[in-house]
């Protein structure tokens, strides 16, 4: 029996080890790479990019001549047909006569033609349309990069929140363990009459509070993991664990570039800035395209055709040969009055041009504001982190001293709980400042490099 129980325990432990080995831990890079491959919104942006590529090809093709072939085949039926023979004379009832035929007739004819046409001049509308389509293609490509950057930023924020929650859980576990230990000691003292029942109740309350904090931090951890899985397009039942960076303290205290340095670098790198610039260029072309409505249009057209019918004595091939004809011509269309359509289009295009210029200025200001806030938050968090480290050390030493004094009866439960609360607050402030510094410092680097890895 003992051997069976031992074997069963060994199997259970082996199963747990196998599960632990097969549960993959995701690094930040792996999360980002997976999201860039599977995110649905990003896939939609890539589809839009492919559509813009097709629009460029279609616009280029409009410069070439159009070519078409046409044919028509016609049949004609005549139930009473006079072919000059096979007729007879009948009276018309008035003393006269007429010739009637008893023969029906069916005739057939066909025509064939090839036509070509192309626009020779239309005020540069087609050329500018090609340029605009290329710009729109580039804007669509930048939209893909914008979405990629947004995903990277969102994943990094949640990743850091998970790291924070993991450490918060460990802090709350340690707090619960010390609170439980103090309660056990207090109960022993109460049994021998060293402390009052009210102090035991206080210690019990502290344990319950520590349990609540632990449950709350675990719930936050689960919520952040769920958000990460949703960003990665993972099923809700799939388990995900993240890889803890080796040097979080070093990341928190990494050197910060100045605001101006970061802004100058980001200005040349960020896709949203390039996108607004290209949008302004596209609006300039839109004005030129609208103005082309005032220009004349010159078109060239040419065609060749032939025909046949069954009434001819010539063969089918001879008919096609002798009926062959060709034509060529040019068409000039000069706009005189178009119900203000062109003028309205020009005015609308200019208004859109002004709006896009303002949008470009706004994007630059927004970028500067974002970088300024990231730098300020990172710098402030670094200073808080350095101060919080000293505060935790002091709070830890004070708590240990009061705990020893409580054990020998020199301090009461209220004083012990106060010191433990101070230590917990200091530890939480340390965690918060550390991960706030990590997030903002790394995001600042991300705006300067396009990569966010730690």
Question: Which residue ranges define each predicted feature?
Answer:
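Bacterial Sec-dependent N-terminal signal peptides
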Residues: 1-28, 452-454
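Bacterial Sec-pathway N-terminal export signals of envelope proteins
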Residues: 20-72, 78, 236, 242-281, ...
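Small/polar, glycine/serine/threonine/aspartate-rich low-complexity segments that form flexible
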Residues: 22-23, 70-118, 245-255, 288, ...
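Periplasmic alpha-helical coiled-coil/stalk elements that build and connect Gram-negative outer-membrane
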Residues: 30, 54, 150-265, 377, ...
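Sec/SRP-type N-terminal targeting helices
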Residues: 43-47, 60-61, 106, 120-148, ...
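Acidic, low-complexity, intrinsically disordered peripheral segments
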Residues: 77, 236, 429-454
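Membrane-embedded beta-strand positions in outer-membrane beta-barrel channels/transporters
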Residues: 113-115, 159, 263, 329-331, ...
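A short glycine-centered flexible hinge/capping loop motif at secondary-structure junctions
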Residues: 190-194, 406-410, 447
């Amino acid at each position: 029996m003992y051997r069976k129980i031992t074997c069963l325990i060994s199997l259970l432990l082996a199963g747990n080890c196998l599960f632990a080995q097969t549960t993959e831990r995701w690094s930040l890079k792996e999360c980002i790479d997976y999201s860039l491959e599977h995110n649905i919104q990003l896939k939609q942006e890539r589809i839009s990019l492919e559509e813009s590529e097709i629009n460029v090809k279609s616009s280029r093709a409009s410069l070439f001549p159009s070519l078409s072939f046409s044919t028509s085949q016609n049949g004609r039926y005549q139930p009473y047909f006079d072919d000059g023979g096979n007729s007879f004379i009948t009276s018309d009832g008035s003393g006269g006569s007429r010739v009637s035929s008893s023969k029906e007739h069916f005739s057939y004819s066909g025509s064939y033609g090839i036509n070509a046409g192309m626009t020779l001049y239309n005020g540069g509308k087609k050329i500018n349309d090609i340029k605009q389509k290329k710009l729109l293609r580039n804007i669509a490509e930048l939209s893909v990069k914008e979405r990629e950057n947004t995903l990277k930023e969102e994943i990094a924020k949640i990743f850091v929140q998970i790291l924070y929650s993991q450490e918060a859980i460990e802090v709350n576990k340690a707090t619960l363990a010390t609170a439980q230990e103090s309660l056990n000691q207090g109960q022993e003292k109460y049994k021998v009459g060293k402390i009052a029942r009210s102090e035991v109740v206080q210690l019990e309350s502290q344990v319950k509070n520590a349990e609540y904090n632990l449950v709350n931090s675990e719930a936050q951890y689960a919520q952040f993991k769920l958000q990460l899985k949703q960003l990665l397009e993972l099923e809700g039942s799939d388990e995900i664990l993240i890889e803890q960076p080796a040097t979080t303290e070093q990341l928190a205290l990494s050197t910060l570039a100045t605001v101006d340095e970061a802004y100058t670098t980001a200005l040349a790198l960020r896709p949203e800035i390039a996108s607004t610039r290209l949008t302004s260029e596209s609006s300039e072309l839109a004005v030129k395209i609208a103005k082309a409505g005032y220009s004349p249009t010159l078109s060239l057209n040419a065609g060749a055709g032939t025909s046949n019918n069954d009434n001819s004595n010539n063969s089918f091939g001879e008919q096609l040969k002798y009926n062959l004809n060709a034509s060529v011509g040019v068409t000039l269309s000069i706009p005189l009055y178009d119900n203000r359509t062109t003028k309205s289009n020009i005015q609308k295009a200019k208004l859109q041009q002004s709006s896009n210029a303002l949008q470009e200025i706004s994007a630059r200001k927004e970028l500067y504001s974002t970088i300024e806030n990231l730098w300020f938050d990172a710098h402030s968090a670094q200073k808080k982190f350095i101060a919080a480290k000293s505060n935790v050390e002091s709070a830890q030493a004070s708590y240990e001293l009061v705990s020893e004094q409580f054990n020998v009866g020199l301090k009461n439960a209220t004083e012990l709980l106060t010191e433990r609360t101070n230590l917990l607050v200091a530890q939480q402030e340390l965690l918060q400042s550390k991960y706030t510094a990590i997030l903002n410092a790394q995001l600042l680097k991300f705006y300067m490099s396009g990569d966010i890895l730690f």
